[in-house]
């Protein structure tokens, strides 16, 4: 076992131990707040991560199509931020996003909402319908016409199904996925007893549906994948690879699957992705590769993936 994998495994265990303590506090659904649309966020203060670094990590971004181009910093938006919906992974809950919520709040994202779906949910399609109803309720309550979504692992797959198969692209501006098995994973513990786990395997009916055409999809995808993610097999299955989707794949080094939603380096890169301006005719989206320089408090190098 390499030293990098040993360090990442140790960090995974530490994160898991901390999450087990926080887990009970996320079991109950959060109470939605009725707020007016937020004001424009404060001017950006830099790209460093918030809070202490739990281990050295670097993130590298590459578009899902095309060759490498010179790396540039991810742009930061100045427009009013839409609500952000956080969607946890399998048998998890909203407590996994404590660090990310703090990072986004400090940046000026005032409207953050988490959705807990039941661990007894047996079908990704059913969970995607639940997400759709939740998004519609948020839009009606806040006056926003669109939202951003961040999904960890299975949560990202649920959100992608909503966007790509249930018309959710009219509501979701940006979908950020963290360690999500977009192409299906060979590691599926519990597949024999839980049907939703079987749907995450390569070749499942859900995965095949997502391979289908998606012309005109209006959602921008940003997928974070880690070369040390032992739940995603192969690791690049966590990348979005679809000719019809506007996608940027971000490579994370030094951490594994469990640490993705809680590591401050990743939180800073997610924050930048959510603050990127939407493409317009006057400001076409740059399809070149980007490098998110968010090495946190410990040294780290970034380069185009």
Kindly give the residue locations of the regions a language model identified.
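Flexible, membrane-associating and regulatory peripheral segments of lipid-active enzymes
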Residues: 1-85, 98, 102, 107, ...
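Short alpha-helix in the alpha/beta-hydrolase fold that links the catalytic acid
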Residues: 100, 233-240
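Acidic catalytic loop of the alpha/beta-hydrolase fold
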Residues: 227-233, 257-258
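Catalytic histidine-centered segment of alpha/beta-hydrolase-like enzymes
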Residues: 124, 256-264
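Catalytic histidine neighborhood in serine/cysteine hydrolases
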Residues: 111, 243-258, 270
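Short, proline-enriched alpha-helix->beta-strand connector loops that line the catalytic pocket
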Residues: 80-82, 215-221, 244-248
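Serine-dependent carboxylesterase/thioesterase catalytic core
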Residues: 84-95, 101-218, 224-225, 231, ...
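Post-His helix in hydrolase/transferase enzymes
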Residues: 261-273
């Amino acid at each position: 076992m390499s030293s990098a994998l040993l360090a990442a495994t140790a960090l995974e265990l530490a994160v898991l131990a901390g999450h087990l303590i926080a887990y009970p506090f996320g079991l109950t659904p959060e109470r939605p707040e009725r707020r007016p649309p937020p004001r424009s966020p404060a001017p950006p203060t830099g790209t460093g991560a918030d809070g202490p670094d739990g281990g050295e990590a670097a993130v590298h971004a590459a578009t899902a199509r095309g060759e490498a181009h010179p790396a540039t910093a991810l742009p930061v938006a100045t427009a009013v931020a839409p609500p952000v919906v956080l969607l946890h992974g399998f048998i998890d809950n909203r407590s996994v996003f404590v660090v990310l919520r703090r990072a986004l709040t400090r940046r000026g994202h005032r409207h953050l909402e988490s959705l807990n779906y039941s661990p007894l949910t047996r079908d990704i399609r059913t969970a995607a319908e639940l997400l759709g109803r939740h998004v519609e309720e948020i839009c009606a309550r806040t006056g926003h016409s669109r939202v951003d979504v961040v999904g960890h692992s299975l949560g990202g797959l649920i959100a992608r199904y909503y966007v790509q198969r249930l018309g959710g692209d009219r509501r979701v501006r940006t979908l950020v996925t963290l360690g999500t098995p977009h192409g299906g994973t060979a590691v599926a513990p519990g597949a024999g007893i839980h049907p939703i786990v079987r749907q995450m395997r390569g070749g499942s009916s859900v995965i095949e549906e997502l391979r289908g055409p998606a012309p005109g999809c209006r959602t921008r995808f940003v997928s974070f994948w880690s070369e040390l993610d032992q739940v995603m097999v192969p690791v690049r299955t966590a990348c979005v690879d679809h000719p019809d989707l506007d996608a940027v794949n971000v490579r994370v080094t030094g951490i594994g699957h469990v640490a993705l939603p809680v590591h401050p380096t990743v939180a800073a890169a997610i924050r930048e992705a959510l603050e990127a301006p939407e493409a317009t005719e006057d400001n076409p989206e740059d399809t070149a590769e980007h490098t998110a320089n968010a090495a946190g408090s410990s040294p780290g190098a970034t380069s185009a993936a």
